[in-house]
């Protein structure tokens, strides 16, 4: 997971480099052994998913005829690492991790404790219309 603290290394690792380039020294981030897959995770990251390749889906050319080779890679999660410092009462404290998200263009956003919120999911009746929408904060019940 890319976080506020790892943003510079994450950005450096987005550079186009030859396929055999080890991006860890380039990024300044530290490799850590994974439990179920060969590739290492990023030690500085508070969370990581270990995945096995399932499918690579080619995307159409943005500009027809340019054949840039854009793909979506899909994997099965076979292992999860979460730093214990971010577990509160059995739940992940996402805000404390301060993950970042790619928005668009060169823009990113950061999740902070003061921007995280929880709300109840609505229940829906058999014909698919919303039967109950409780706008209050999440009550701890999964629906």
Language-model features: where?
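Basic, polyanion-binding surface patches
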Residues: 1-143
């Amino acid at each position: 997971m890319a976080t506020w603290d790892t943003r510079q290394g994450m950005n450096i690792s987005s550079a186009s480099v030859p396929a055999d380039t080890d991006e860890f020294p380039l990024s300044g981030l530290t490799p850590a052994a994974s439990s179920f897959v060969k590739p290492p995770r990023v030690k500085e990251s508070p969370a990581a998913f270990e995945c096995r390749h399932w499918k690579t889906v080619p995307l159409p050319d943005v500009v027809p005829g340019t054949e840039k080779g854009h793909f979506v890679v899909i994997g099965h999660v076979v292992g999860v690492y979460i730093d214990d410092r971010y577990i509160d009462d059995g739940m992940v404290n996402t805000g404390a991790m301060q993950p970042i998200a790619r928005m668009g263009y060169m823009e990113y956003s950061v999740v902070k404790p003061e921007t995280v919120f929880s709300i109840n999911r609505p229940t829906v009746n058999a014909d698919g219309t919303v039967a109950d929408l409780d706008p209050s904060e999440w009550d701890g019940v999964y629906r």
